[in-house]
């Protein structure tokens, strides 16, 4: 057994941590560590030591640093990425993630909140073990720059001598964070983390530490021009409408009414609908076009790049391990690479070249309003390291493949094995006629496509509408499409029922229920666990059945973080939603294994988005694409019979092929 040291630090930097992320935060010239609290697992829970870095005890500092740099001692922290990055910068020593364990990730794997205070409260820790609520004010006082005033002598930073009483409170706060982290760790110690997940987290940390290169000169030109262009559009809107503030919805709606255009609401969708009207007055059309252009917030991602990039023009820390705690998938941070506009420009490379040259006049002439072009160029700001190119490889239709595999929908699996178009095959099964993409009954392919994307997780008409954004299927046909898809996929429909029945059974009877392909439902300490084929488990905290007076039925309810409100509370689930979680979790595990295989070949994965990975590859390595695609398509031992395929391409900048 390794000795374990729990760590928490308080720091100072003039860079905003929330806006820039920890990697840019520690590069500020004034970055410093103020307080360090630590405890060893063999000391007893009340023996936390605190180092005041302004007046450090040399013996304590030596003890801490010796343990920190000892590879035989395991270090734990809540959000260990922060402690690792700060301590590495402060000591100018590497902090290998293999020596660390992240208590936040442990909490996330169990469906708990990803913040120390929230996790402690969700676990019902006693008051003396909870995070100190005074912390935010103390952090603002000591860890961030202060506004110079006559009262404070025009200083821009508060030091311990400026308020000794507050400083003592800050030391107590720092100590209490270790107490809370250790109590959370103790409470969760009965739930073992697979070693494979720890290895994957270490790979994730290396990826975040390495980061991805950005074309900063191009980004700077885009931000500078966009600022000017937005001002021009604002002035044009004022001139056309005569309004002091055309951004005001109330003012704009009154003006529209005066032009004979009644719009009950002015949203992206209603503006798009209005612009389709050939009889729309020209002045109204132009004003609505301007409003749409000014509403493009994607340019904010370029501003984030400028704030968050490091001195070597690399962006780090853009992936949060286990950020989606229902499936264990990664979540985006800072630039939010999981939420980027599609590439639809006829010549993306030319548009990018014009942006890099700062020739925005030609760009506007060739491609239209620059705000929309900039939205599509965000991906292209990510560039390979010097002497490299990107190889981008992703799983082809991974969720549809996994869903068919866990359900045992053989016709779908066979279609994938034969390399057929799944949308055509689905439409063919639904309507009992041959369907070819550019041939017989090709008009049915769109129905097959929308159904594949909308119906797999018990989706109905509402899901069809969300997927069919262009309204290609008449509304009165949607229910029929849903029914046809369900009729063609009886094994998937059965899987929804089986998963819901399994969950209800384990909640009521507290026993294990096993399904196909290594999936098993269990119930431990009031929590529902779903074991995946990989051996990883999904957790639904405090799962129970609860009567809903609206329909008189008992629903499956668990405690979780609401994806919209971000608040901890009761959340309902059902068969189709459980199938969605399982499918996406297995897809995530497939990507994880593929990334580990690619990394084992010596390749440098700079980031991954959904089901694709982006790899920095030396230009002279001409076999890389084939080798990386092979890793993606290689069979996985715990998923026999799952047909996987990697599709990839090479590119001098990130893009969607």
Q: Where in the sequence are the language-model features?
A:
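Conserved "right-hand" nucleotidyltransferase catalytic core of DNA-directed polymerases
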Residues: 1-17, 28-31, 35-37, 46-47, ...
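A short acidic-Thr-Gly-centered motif at the start of a beta-strand
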Residues: 1-3, 65-69, 373-389, 596-600
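Conserved catalytic palm subdomain of right-hand nucleotidyl-transferase polymerases, strongest
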Residues: 6-7, 78, 99-102, 382-398
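Short active-site loop/helix that positions an aromatic residue
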Residues: 13, 81-93, 110, 254-258, ...
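Active-site-proximal helix-loop-helix substrate-binding element of RNase H-like nuclease domains
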Residues: 28-34, 38-189, 346, 426-431, ...
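Active-site palm subdomain of RNA-directed nucleic acid polymerases
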Residues: 188-200, 590-613
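Generic long, charged, amphipathic alpha-helical segments
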Residues: 422-442, 551-606
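A common structural junction motif
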Residues: 631-639
């Amino acid at each position: 057994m390794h000795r374990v040291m729990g760590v928490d630090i308080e720091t100072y930097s003039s860079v905003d941590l929330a806006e820039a992320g920890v990697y840019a935060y520690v590069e500020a010239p004034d970055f410093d560590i103020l307080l360090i609290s630590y405890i060893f697992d063999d000391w007893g829970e009340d023996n936390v030591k605190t180092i005041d870095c302004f007046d450090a005890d040399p013996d304590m500092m030596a003890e801490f640093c010796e343990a920190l740099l000892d590879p035989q001692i395991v270090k734990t922290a809540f959000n260990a990425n922060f402690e690792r990055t700060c301590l590495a910068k402060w000591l100018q020593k590497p902090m290998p993630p293999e020596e660390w364990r992240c208590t936040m990730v442990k909490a996330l794997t169990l469906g708990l909140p990803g913040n120390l205070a929230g996790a402690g409260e969700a676990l019902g820790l006693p008051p003396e073990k909870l995070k100190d609520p005074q912390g935010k004010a103390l952090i603002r006082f000591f860890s961030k720059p202060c506004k110079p005033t006559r009262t404070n002598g025009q200083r821009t930073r508060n030091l311990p001598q400026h308020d000794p009483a507050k400083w003592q409170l800050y030391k107590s706060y720092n100590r209490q964070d270790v107490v809370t982290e250790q109590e959370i760790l103790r409470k969760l110690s009965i739930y073992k983390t697979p070693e494979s997940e720890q290895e994957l987290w270490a790979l994730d940390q290396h990826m975040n530490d390495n980061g991805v290169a950005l074309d900063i000169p191009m980004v700077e030109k885009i931000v500078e021009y966009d600022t000017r262009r937005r001002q021009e559009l604002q002035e044009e809107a004022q001139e056309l409408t005569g309004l002091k503030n055309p951004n005001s919805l109330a003012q704009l709606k009154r003006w529209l009414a005066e032009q004979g255009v009644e719009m009950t609401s002015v949203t992206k969708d209603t503006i798009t609908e209005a612009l389709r009207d050939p009889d729309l007055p020209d002045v109204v059309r132009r004003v609505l076009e301007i409003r749409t252009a000014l509403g493009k917030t994607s340019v904010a991602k370029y501003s984030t790049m400028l704030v968050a990039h490091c001195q070597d023009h690399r962006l780090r820390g853009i992936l949060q391990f286990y950020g989606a705690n229902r499936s264990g998938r990664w979540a985006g941070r800072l630039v939010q690479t999981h939420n980027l506009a599609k590439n639809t420009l006829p010549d993306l490379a030319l548009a990018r070249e014009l942006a890099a040259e700062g020739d925005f006049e030609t760009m506007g002439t060739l491609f239209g309003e620059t705000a929309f072009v900039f939205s599509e160029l965000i991906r292209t700001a990510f560039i390979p390291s010097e002497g490299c190119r990107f190889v981008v490889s992703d799983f082809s239709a991974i969720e549809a493949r996994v869903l068919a595999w866990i359900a045992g929908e053989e016709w779908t699996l066979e279609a994938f094995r034969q390399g057929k178009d799944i949308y055509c095959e689905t439409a063919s099964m639904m309507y009992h006629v041959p369907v070819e993409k550019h041939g017989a009954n090709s008009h049915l392919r769109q129905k097959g496509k929308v159904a594949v994307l909308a119906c797999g997780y018990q989706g109905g008409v509402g899901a069809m509408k969300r997927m069919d954004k262009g309204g290609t299927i008449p509304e009165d046909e949607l229910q029929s499409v849903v029914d046809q898809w369900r009729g063609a996929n009886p094994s998937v429909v059965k899987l929804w029922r089986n998963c819901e029945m399994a969950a209800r059974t384990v909640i009521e009877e507290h026993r294990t229920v096993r399904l196909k392909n290594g999936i098993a439902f269990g119930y431990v300490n009031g929590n529902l666990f779903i074991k995946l084929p990989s051996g990883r488990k999904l957790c639904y905290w405090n799962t129970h059945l609860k009567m809903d007076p609206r329909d008189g039925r008992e629903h499956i309810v668990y405690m979780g973080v609401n994806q919209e409100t971000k608040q901890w509370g009761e959340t309902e689930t059902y068969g189709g939603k459980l199938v969605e979680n399982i499918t996406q979790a297995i897809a995530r595990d497939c990507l994880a294994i593929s990334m580990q295989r690619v990394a084992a070949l010596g390749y440098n994965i700079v980031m991954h988005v959904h089901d694709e990975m982006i790899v920095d590859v030396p230009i002279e390595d001409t076999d890389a694409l084939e080798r990386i695609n092979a890793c993606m398509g290689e069979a996985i031992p715990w998923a026999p019979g799952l047909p996987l395929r990697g599709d990839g391409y090479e590119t001098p900048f990130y893009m969607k092929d």
